[in-house]
């Protein structure tokens, strides 16, 4: 949630260099763990920060993870630059619903009565949210930034399902990768990908697009997102972890973004958005109850 809030501070900044710096600082956070695990394995071995050595048969899965996450990030950043955070937050809060539907199709999970209530309430709240957006001149059908945020949410859901596949043992439908391999290396792969995008796409047109200016929020975003991902991957690595529940709790970050949008950014139509947010949260609660 705090990561989303600090992203909002970069509304008038160039997206691509900001993303490049995010991946750079995130990589720098985890690079010492990789180096120590290789050169002084005794220091981190048997700790939660140890990064095992792995070959291409493992890293190819991490590269795909990097592509999915980076695509979601880019779409999300462009959308967030052009939409109120109180619109973006609840749309992102529908990710657990998409993850649950994906788990239903991909992993063969079945929805019970409470889970169906949760899904329907979340979908209904999304349509209610579109009405709140129109009060600010945002038409969900004709505003391309809405589609950016929706696609970012879809890719985020795909990423969540893929995380389940990466972390879960073979007997639970996954391949059982080490979580530190995934988080440490996918940041580094993202760094190289963003470096290429920065050089090829942004640098030649930098004078005719939104200018880049340095802000300390860029470092804070990297720290908060890295910390959130670390706890998230740790949760998924626990035996019997359910991606539908983990994803639902994670998207509780919408509370933080909504509170800051109301108190700090003074965004409009908060009463109607609050109703939509309550519907999203009630839907999440029913999903939780149905998963007990």
State what each model feature region is.
Residues 14-71, 121, 181-205, 257:
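Transmembrane alpha-helices of multi-pass small-molecule transport proteins
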Residues 42-75, 144-154, 207-231:
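Loop-to-transmembrane-helix transition segments
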Residues 8-9, 18, 79, 105-111, ...:
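Hydrophobic/aromatic residues within transmembrane alpha-helices
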Residues 11-17, 75-91, 172-180, 230-252:
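Structural motif at transmembrane-helix junctions in multi-pass transporters
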Residues 2-6:
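Short, small-residue-biased leader/transition segments that mark boundaries at the very start
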